[in-house]
Design a protein with these regions (language model features):
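N-terminal amphipathic/basic-hydrophobic helices that include classical n-h-c signal peptides
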Residues: 1-10
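Catalytic, metal-anchored helix/loop core of enzyme active sites in primary metabolism
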Residues: 11-390
Length: 390
């Protein structure tokens, strides 16, 4: 279904950015400003960062701004009162703005479970989805892919790895194996004993990508890569055993596909998230993009390692949840969001992250119901249980 993408005609595309103040959102704005003849930021939304969304709105002059935190509504409204910009607040408003008739593309770049319902609303409104919120497919992959097929909506991946896989696809040629690359995170060379004592500051020092705090911690535990495995299963319709995680510290190969004849096709480049963002907006066209270029002569070596699930059990838990199916990935995601925040707030140690997730997987009732109601209730139960374990 992700190839159902005959959406880009010659008119300027109006983009709704869910999460304009985050890492993906700010880089998407850079892409839009580089190609202001092709794209327009029609809607900007933020959860809490009123100051940044105000400055973005004053610069980009969108039609609509939404601040999800209702306590910040008056601050945003008053700061933009001299401009003809509609300002709304609250989670419900996020689901409403994506349905605006003038919106062509919804960039789903909110972090976490909060991105699920606005993405569903956008699919039902038949908007093209540029998907950066991986939790949407982790939590509700079955539901999302079913809705995308039903409403004939294209889903274009924005994750660097999934964009790489998407760029390597050959319609009509089956995927034998997906090679999902991973930098290995800041603790790649740590022993099991050393990992027991790492701090949030150690974890936030990611070696390659500039990301928000939540995803940086997930990258340190390899849960981020586990989520990407689940995401790849739904985006590309492959079985879990067809997805192989490959540790590639240089982050030059962003991912690859092996075809049935054994040929491997990879996408290479410098680590710049603007490229997958722009490609999701412009597909099937490629547009100029300013910035660094990959210089093959400067590469000393490209190395590859197997992931160690003894030292990084979160990757194993993600695979287990995918094999079990049903609401198990939803349970893992909910518990992970709780422990991720607790670790960032210095309330738990690093080893507790995987331990609490695993205990939550064992405790919360399993269900094969793929309705939104089931996912909402599972998410609530799993969060509450994980919080009690902290």
């Amino acid at each position: 279904f992700i190839l159902n993408t005959n959406i880009h005609n010659s008119m300027k595309k109006r983009i709704c950015i869910l999460g304009s103040t985050g890492s993906i959102g700010t880089q998407a704005i850079d892409v839009i400003e580089q190609h202001s003849d092709l794209y327009e930021a029609y809607v900007l939304t933020a959860y809490n960062n009123a100051e940044l969304v105000i400055s973005q709105a004053r610069r980009l002059k969108p039609e609509v701004v939404v601040i999800a935190n209702e306590a910040k509504y008056e601050t945003v409204r008053d700061a933009l009162s001299d401009l003809p910009i509609k300002v709304y607040a609250g989670a419900k408003a996020l689901c409403e703005v994506v349905q605006d008739d003038n919106v062509d593309i919804v960039l789903a770049s909110m972090v976490g479970f909060a991105g699920l319902e606005p993405t569903i609303a956008a699919i039902k409104a038949k908007k093209a989805i540029a998907l950066a919120n991986k939790e949407t497919l982790v939590v509700a992959g079955d539901l999302i892919t079913r809705l995308a097929n039903e409403y004939k909506v294209p889903i274009l991946p924005v994750d660097s790895e999934h964009s790489a896989i998407f760029q390597c696809l050959e319609p009509g040629n089956k995927i034998d194996k997906i090679l999902l690359t991973c930098s290995g995170g800041p603790f790649r060379r740590f022993t099991k004993e050393q990992i027991q004592h790492v701090t949030k500051d150690d974890a936030l020092a990611h070696p390659t990508w500039n990301m928000g705090a939540k995803i940086t911690i997930d990258s340190a535990t390899l849960m981020n890569k586990g989520f990407e495995v689940i995401e790849a299963r739904w985006l590309f319709g492959v079985r879990p055993e067809q997805i192989q995680v490959v540790i590639h510290p240089q982050s030059v190969i962003h991912s690859a596909i092996q075809f049935e004849d054994g040929a491997v096709k990879a996408q290479l480049g410098v680590p710049d998230m603007r490229l997958p963002i722009q490609y999701a907006f412009s597909f099937p066209r490629r547009l100029p993009l300013n910035g660094e270029r990959l210089d093959l002569f400067s590469l000393k070596d490209l190395t590859f390692e197997r992931p160690d699930t003894e030292r990084f059990p979160c990757l194993r838990l993600a695979y287990e949840s995918l094999h079990q199916g049903g609401n198990m990935p939803c349970i893992v995601n909910a518990a992970n969001e709780v422990v991720n925040r607790a670790f960032l707030e210095d309330r738990i140690s690093y080893p507790k992250i995987a331990q609490i997730i695993e205990k939550t997987m064992e405790k919360i009732p399993f269900s094969t119901d793929s309705s939104l109601e089931c996912y909402l209730s599972t998410d609530h139960m799993a969060r509450e249980y994980a919080k009690r374990l902290i």
